Amino acid sequence: MKKQVLILSILMLCSFLATQAQTKETRNVSTFTKISFRVPGKIYVRQGSPQKVVIEGKKEILKEIETDVDGSRLVIETDDKWDWNLWKDDDDEVIVYITVKDIDGLSVGGSGDLIGETKIITDDINLNVSGSGSMKVEVEASGDMEGDVSGSGNIDVRGKCKSFNSDVSGSGKAIVSLSISGNADFGVSGSGKIEADGSASSVKTSISGSGKVLAANLETNSCEVRISGSGDVEINVKNELDAIISGSGSVRYKGNPSKVNSASSGSGNVRKL
């Protein structure tokens, strides 16, 4: 009897260890150009061929991970019935490795982290982080690029594009290092921050709240600033600056613009750096 109990205990232990061991699975999915990552963990994205999706983690967790293509979007998420309390520590993280030929959209929802392992060459692209996650990519886009953050997460994007739009809502951050041949449009609502360097033909900036747009190292020909609240803007402008402040916000500028238009209702001010 004791021997049977011992054998049963060993079998149970082996079964438990098997579920706790790290394993890899290759998922077969249809063609996609967009990726949505909605689980705790890390995702590494490479642009190339052939298309490949590999997930790594504990076996008991991997069986709850869904990798479905909706239209042109690969969605990586858990089953709706998943008990998030089981995701206790770093050992429970899922790691995803993706190789894909064309990329025009990347998004992170929740606390995940997305890392671009290669430069992404594309036409237009949309980048988005919602929650406390992060994204770090290098992109060469011949068209338009968007990089938005909602929540406390952050985006770090480098490269070049025709136009760039970034909206940060909440306490998140966008770090931007881009050569922009056309217009850059920065918007912050809340206490978030945009840090930018590089160049752009023109810049539009709007802040609602206590956020910041720190772009003293972003060279531009003209800049339009609108602040409502206590937000702060720094910019490097060559030709024309137009700033309207409602509240206690401030605008600091580098360069020697030939034309500076400013108006303030409140204690806000516009000054040279």
Language-model-detected regions and their locations in the chain:
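N-terminal secretory signal peptides that target proteins for export/translocation
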Residues: M1-K2
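Acidic (Asp/Glu) and glycine-rich low-complexity loops/linkers
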Residues: V5-L8, T19-S130, K136-D148, D156-N165, ...
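Hydrophobic core
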Residues: M12-A18
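Histidine-centered metal-chelating micro-motifs
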Residues: S134, N154, K193
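Short, surface-exposed interaction patches in beta-rich subdomains
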Residues: V157-K162, G172-L273
